[in-house]
UniProtKB/Swiss-Prot annotation:
InterPro entries: Glutathione-S-Trfase_C_sf (IPR036282), Metaxin1/3 (IPR017410), Metaxin_GST (IPR033468), Mito_Protein_Transport_Metaxin (IPR050931), Sam37/metaxin_N (IPR019564). Involved in transport of proteins into the mitochondrion. Essential for embryonic development. It is found in: Mitochondrion outer membrane. GO terms for biological process: mitochondrion organization; protein insertion into mitochondrial outer membrane. The chain crosses the membrane at residues 281-301. GO terms for cellular component: cytoplasm; mitochondrial outer membrane; SAM complex. It comes from the Eukaryota. This is Metaxin-1 homolog. The keyword Membrane applies. Keywords: Membrane, Mitochondrion, Mitochondrion outer membrane, Protein transport, Transmembrane, Transmembrane helix, Transport. Belongs to the metaxin family. Associates with the mitochondrial contact site and cristae organizing system (MICOS) complex (also known as MINOS or MitOS complex). It comes from Drosophila melanogaster.
Length: 327
């Protein structure tokens, strides 16, 4: 396989200046850009074509490699290992730190983006729906919500489907703040966590913190805490602006960094946001019509065919194996 010939990485398009809205996509992008791998990136993507029902995926010719682990394995084999410049000791430290960050930030990320009802309904659902083709965009984001339910149940011990007063969000916030404090101390005044060279650990930290810090969620206690750690803010902004200056995207330009509770918008931007309700109503009517037409077609088709039906009747999402740590 030649990485230069026809290789393409498919990811969700970004927002709020980020190159992608999704953690897995963002750290896959870090693999490419940190190592300067000569590969094109496609953001107008259909997750259903990945073979796993999700993004990211890498395609080389007719071969597809879905998910971060497979993508990293291909890049390692092709001569673009992200930790090549680290010493053996640093590699072990990187793995240990990554496991600790994963343990304490993964549940926070899933809960506050997908499990917290108001955040999901007002922000996250729309971000993923707009990046998924019609008519799948009306129910595809819910697959991430179901995955978040499993993650939170295993890692935090409560069910996001319970009443809101039973959600132990404070527990997630306390642990996440401890992680941010340690990361800030570990980074200090360095450019990267291990000095002058990037690592997979930098990619993991950036991917978590950039999304949590940049995406304007109504309820996001960690956002202001990150804002108080100026070296981490500089870390996020430097990578976003310098390394992802081409992929970074914003559909609505904010006049200041989102604070999680308010953002200063121009008159035209407010008009854009006010139109969202009308857009959702029209889209909902379209979804009903599309589903009705599909149901009618299925009925006619089943009457005309005698073979047993194994037709597409929804999306089976193959859940990624829960990682015990970030390799």
């Amino acid at each position: 396989m030649e990485m230069q010939l026809g290789a393409m990485l498919y990811v969700y398009k970004g927002e709020y200046g980020l190159p992608s809205i999704d953690f897995e996509c963002l750290r896959a992008l870090c693999l490419l850009r940190f190592t300067r791998c000569p590969m094109d990136v496609q953001t107008s993507s259909n997750p259903l074509r990945s073979g796993a029902g999700k993004l990211p995926y890498l395609q080389i010719g007719n071969q597809k490699f879905a998910g971060y682990r497979q993508i990293k394995r291909v890049l390692d084999l092709e001569g673009y290992p992200i930790d090549a410049h680290l010493s053996t000791k640093q590699k072990h430290l990187s793995t240990a730190y990554a496991n600790w960050v994963f343990t304490n930030l993964h549940a926070y990320y899933h809960y506050f983006l997908f499990g917290e009802p108001h955040n999901f309904d007002t922000t996250t659902r729309g971000l993923y729906a707009k990046r998924t083709p019609f008519p799948f965009n009306f129910y595809y984001p819910s697959s991430y919500q179901r995955e978040a339910c499993d993650v939170v149940q295993v890692m935090a011990g409560f069910d996001v489907n319970d009443k809101l007063d039973k959600h132990e969000g404070d527990y997630l916030v306390v642990n996440a703040k401890k992680v941010v404090n340690l990361l800030s101390r570990k980074l200090g005044r360095k450019v990267w966590f291990f000095g002058d060279t990037y690592s997979e650990f930098d990619a993991i930290v950036y991917s978590y913190l950039a999304i949590i810090f940049k995406i304007a969620l109504p309820n996001n206690p960690l956002q202001n805490h990150i804002k108080g750690c100026q070296n981490l803010v500089n870390f996020i902004n430097r990578i976003t602006k310098d390394i992802f200056r081409i992929e970074g995207y914003s559909s609505v330009k904010l006049t200041k960094t989102p604070s999680g509770t308010e953002a200063s918008l121009t008159a035209s931007e407010r008009k854009f946001l006010d139109s969202e309700l009308n857009t959702k109503i029209v889209a909902g009517v379209g979804a009903v019509l599309a589903m009705g037409a599909f149901a009618a077609w299925r009925g006619i088709y089943n009457q005309l065919t005698t073979r047993s039906s194994t037709d597409y009747d929804g999306i089976d999402y193959e859940d990624d194996e829960m990682e015990e740590g970030l390799d």
